[in-house]
């Protein structure tokens, strides 16, 4: 199961952290945010993923997959795709 979140403001970052820390992959759809707000979320998510030993992949310009450590395979990047 993957949790998809479409935050409306930075106060909702707590939900990204909550689901990720419980071991659930999280898709962050940041299309509803300004570029500055989206950057804050990406910075938060990068720290979260680094600290917990997971992976973060960009699915589109403002959509990211956060994969907890030990939860399956990464999504191949454009460079890695066949």
Label each PLM-derived region with a short phrase.
Residues 1-34, 43-82:
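Positively charged, small/polar-rich N-terminal and surface patches that mediate targeting and assembly
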């Amino acid at each position: 199961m993957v949790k998809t979140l479409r935050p409306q403001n930075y106060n909702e970052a707590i939900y990204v952290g909550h689901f990720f820390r419980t071991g659930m992959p999280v898709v962050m759809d940041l299309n509803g945010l300004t570029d500055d707000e989206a950057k804050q979320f990406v910075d938060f998510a990068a720290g979260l993923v680094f600290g917990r030993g997971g992976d973060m992949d960009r699915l589109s310009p403002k959509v990211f997959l956060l994969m907890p450590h030990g939860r399956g395979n990464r999504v191949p990047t454009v460079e890695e795709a066949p």
